[in-house]
């Protein structure tokens, strides 16, 4: 709950839709046919990339004016192939530094994504991590997964896509609240990943594994802690029956819907979640940066209408 001091803001440079493979189809596009995805592979339209970079630059400048140290990714390898003895692909994007990096106490943890195309994504942040390591942080990388086909369920409709074969999860499957970490089993994290995280962190932290909130991917459009004692819930996914025990005594803000956005511009077949408006960035316990179109969360300034 301390004020934000340092952050990595991503970039839209080289953002693309990857050529379909089992990991992309099972974890990212389970509702689409492979041939449909294949028709739309390649870089996003340049206008989307330029407009998003403009927004990210403004966000970076805003945070800098608030006294936050801002880092940006090194895109040297962004347009490069990535491969292992078991698979090959191409690096995806550097939109989301949060997705694959956990900062817990003085530990930097690079997490093992189940998606082929994300295995080298954290290379973009190595300079930042190296600096923090020199300052005394512990720097941990989870075991590099083989990502054989047995990791992915045959039928993923409405259920998490991953079997419990390897340690697989993304950092954005987690929400940390003091010494408690809520861990979501989904298309981007299996139970074994939560077990590994608990063993790695030891007895100073408690990892709470949940499977009944949202099976698609990350937690940050489902549950967002604002400050100690106040949490935002996605009302379409969280109920009083399935809410995590760690939040039962907290005040709740229930978001019934987000403002409409142009979900799939330029004729693209998909876009952001309809709940993307729940993504906001807390600078301190009294200040959050919110999409200006999202009147619903803005109404609840300081937890009140």
Locations of regions flagged by a protein language model:
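The feature marks the mature, well-folded catalytic cores of soluble enzymes
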Residues: 1-305
